[in-house]
């Protein structure tokens, strides 16, 4: 309704978010502030529509939301997630680059409090240009935060240009390994592969975990896949009809 949004970035991580909330994460929609729940941070906060959809499917909103009224004035579902207005949001985000450092803080708190929960972060490959990301990575290494799992959405695009045009990031996995992280590289659209990677990470002790995912921006829509013009935008009525057919949805 706000006539704006970020559909490409949201679809890039749809399979990861769905797998985390519907399979991997230990959360309770009836008690969203449960002290022992797993934590989730969407560092690339502009992709939040897919987070809202996952929370909805998991049962955080009663009755189930049929129309999100995304970005509408006064709506619970704004263009960047807010922990103060939307149930189930563990951390407000939108200012790129902060998720890993905040996640490291949450994971460190769990260690100090002797809690067993995991903290999951999804960040974009573009935002890894922010120095604070690597400060968080370094801190997590030093504290051996093996309860921290960071997914990197390696779709190759950022707001206006390719990531490689701005600053080459082809060696993302090697950078994490150089910092001492347990690192895996997978497809971000293989549900079984995502499940397996999470299981491996949770069983590997002594190091924080990076799961670098090869993703396709706008995944699932023929007119949107790998088309950076859809970093922002709103489909036309005709494109909505195409999207419903290609994604198998009704609305």
Predicted regions and their residues:
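N-terminal capping segment at the start of a domain
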Residues: 1-4, 153-155
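Structural motif
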Residues: 4-11
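Histidine-centered active-site/metal-ligand motif
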Residues: 6, 46, 79-80, 98, ...
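Cofactor-binding active-site loop characterized by glycine-rich and histidine/acidic residues
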Residues: 11-142
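Glycine-rich beta-alpha junction loops
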Residues: 15, 46-47, 51, 155-156, ...
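Structured core elements
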Residues: 41, 149, 185, 210-212
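Thiamine diphosphate
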Residues: 88, 92-203
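Glycine/aspartate-rich loop-and-adjacent alpha/beta segment that forms the canonical ThDP
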Residues: 191-251
